[in-house]
Amino acid sequence: MELTLHEARVIGCLLEKEVTTPEQYPLSLNALTLACNQKTSREPVLELTEAQVQDALDSLNKKRLISEQSGFGSRVVKYKHRFCNTEFSELQLSTAAVAIVCLLLLRGPQTPGELRTRSNRLHDFKDVLEVEACIKQLMERDKPVLTQLPREPGKRECRYTELFSQGSEQVSATSLSADSPSADSNSLNAQDRQQLEARVTQLEGQVAELKDKLESLIASLS
């Protein structure tokens, strides 16, 4: 399963609203667009048009990750996810796991502490240890759905990211690149040192030349 940024946002919103506002679920295109563009609890904040959300829905429908629903007497089409915990889904998750995956889809990589703080409307974790236990289970599945990122400089906790979206792959690649300097960067550093040494030698020569001229000037005046 590989989701684009827009698809991941749509799935995350459907997962979230199913739990937090069940009376409004499934969601219409308009309601889903508003959910995708929320200014809070979203990272990054997006400004998707209804057309962009519809494109994401069409793509997810082809992947059989969402379904459409029309009520009697209503022409408004509403959408619900088939991402997990349905008879059509291979992915079966606990409510705790759904909360963690949902938050990672909506807000990107996070620490266990951040996940516990932000999950209160989705699941009531007793403490960070419970979050960490759930994360461990998700990482030890036959098909892991989470991965741990290298610890950031100056931070005590590692962050975790989901493995469903393209964004998570980019984050992982960036983290690994930052954690392990490449041969190209080492080569560039060596080149910079050579240029710096050449510049220093040039400046030393200019200083010596100016010193000689100054001494000659002083000698001519005395």
Curated annotation (Swiss-Prot):
Compositionally biased residues, Polar residues: 169-193
Record Gene3D superfamilies: Winged helix-like DNA-binding domain superfamily/Winged helix DNA-binding domain (1.10.10.10)
Coiled coil region boundaries: none
Similarity-based family: Belongs to the UPF0502 family.
Signal sequence coordinates: none
Protein name (database record): UPF0502 protein SO_1867
InterPro entries: DUF480, WH-like_DNA-bd_sf, WH_DNA-bd_sf
Region Disordered: start-end pairs: 169-195
Organism: Shewanella oneidensis (strain ATCC 700550 / JCM 31522 / CIP 106686 / LMG 19005 / NCIMB 14063 / MR-1)
